[in-house]
Amino acid sequence: DKEKYNSSNIITGESLYHELKEHLLGEPEQREIIRKYEEKLSQYFFDNETITLIPKHDQDVVNIKIGSDKQFPISELGDGLQQVIILTYEAFIKKDETHAFFIEEPELHMHAGMVRQLMNFYLNETKNYYFFTTHSNHLLDMADESDQVIIQKFVKQPKENPKDGFDFKIYRCDRDRDLLASLGVKPSSVYLANCTIWVEGI
C-alpha cells in the first residue's frame, strides 16, 4: 500500500537539519539524546575524536565539528561517513522503542571496516529489527559472529502453470552455520569470493 510510505517513514537525510534543531532547542532530555548520539558516532566511526553536530542558523545546513578542527558542512565529509550519519541517526534517536528498518545495500560508499562498525552499532546500541539487501561478503560474515544475524535467500520460481507468473521462495541459509564453521568455511566463501587474484601477462 503506497499510502503507508511517505516522507515521515522514508529516511533520506533531508530532515536531519530540522530534527537536530528540534532536539537541541527542546527539552533537556532531547539534548541529552543528541549528546549520546554524538558520543556513539565518535566511538564507532571517528576514532574517539569529539564530534559535534550543529544545525547552522538560517542556512538549513548541518555542520560537523571533529575534535579541534573548524566546523564544516557534513556534505564535505566522505560519502561513507555521510551515509553512516543518515543510516544511524533515526535508528539511535528511536532506540527506546522497537522499529523495523529496511535498508538497501548499506555497504555502498563504505569500506569493509566501516560496514562492520555500522553493523556493530546496530547490534550493540539499538534494539530495532533491520532487513538488508546486500552483495557484501562482510555482512554475510556477521552471521558467524552474532546469533542475532540471519541470512535468507530469495529465489524466483515459476508457478506450476507458467502462465500464472512466478513466486518468490525464501530459504534460510544460516542453519548450517555449525557445519560450515567446523569445515572452516565462512558464509562469504559460499556466496561471494573472499579475494580476487589478478594475473598479468595473459
Language-model features, listed with the residues they occupy:
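A short linear hydrophobic-aromatic micro-motif
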Residues: 49-53
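Conserved strand-helix element at the start of the C-terminal RecA-like helicase core
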Residues: 196-202
